[in-house]
Amino acid sequence: MNVNLIHLFFVKNTYRKGLFIMSKRLVAFFSASGTTKKVANMIAEEAKADLFEIESKIPYTKADLDWMNKKSRSSVEMSDKKCRPEIMEKEIDMSSYDEILLGFPIWWYMAPTIINTFLETYDFSGKKIVLFATSGGSGFGNTVKELQSSASDAVITEGSLLNRGTKQEISDWVKSL
């Protein structure tokens, strides 16, 4: 057997109890403006993963997203770490996924609190969660730490800022996982 094929088999599959089982990925994302949604769709296609959109029960308006206004909805939510915006409840069996690629826009150097809502709504026990984000200029900050308490039985790792959203950037990132 070709050595490269063996390597590919070991890298792309999970070994459990003497059997190789294809690991299954889910790309879950929240996008208020459409930027993260575009990136998430490209990641799902490249990773051959299922796609799940995290949607707010009350959609965000342009005024809600005005970070310059301290009374805007996003500013109020981000100033209260206990805030958990309601999400649309959707049926999904998280037990069928090994790895979750979780995407969101960066708000105030971290994930929007709606991501905490998502992590507290579903069971992520034993899951690997890799973060990706879009941002106008800030990085992940303390995002991993802020999210870990919402999914304490999962392993959450900082992935990548995918601001350009080019096919090559996304392809390279997915291959690096």
Question: Can you name each region flagged by the protein language model?
Answer:
Residues A47-A49, K127, A154-V155:
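A structural micro-motif
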